[in-house]
Amino acid sequence: MKKLSYLLMIVAIMIPFVVCSAQSTSQKSVNSPVVEVLYFHVPQRCKTCVALENAAKEVVNTRFANDVKSGKVKFKEIDLNTKDGEKIGDKYEVAWSSLIIVRKDGKKEKTANLTDDGFRYAVNNKVKIQGLIADKINEFLK
């Protein structure tokens, strides 16, 4: 009988620690920033536009595969000729093919426009633009 009493006492003491630990873990995942890689386009795309989209997708899906699975990193292709696409384009002040990386942390947003670098490097230096994209994603995940 004494053993059972001691066991129940130990369990009763441990319950608050387990509950607190579970709450702090779930709060960390809720408060983690989400990074969205937004590729904006119009229906007619040039060679450079296609190369930029492919480079960005490849970085997100290969280097950040685990973050994509967990929902921390997302790639979104946005057609500016749709109502939703136009609305999102207006929000980020985009009117043509562009690459915007967004860090969302609660109600706060921070953006980085990699369009100029994207058009500079997408065709002739894919490794360079992919490095810039990866660096910005890593920075925004912190």
Residue ranges and their predicted role:
Residues V42-C49, E53, T82, A122-K126, ...:
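Solvent-exposed, acidic/flexible segments
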Residues I101-K142:
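Non-catalytic, surface beta->alpha helical segment in thiol-disulfide oxidoreductase systems
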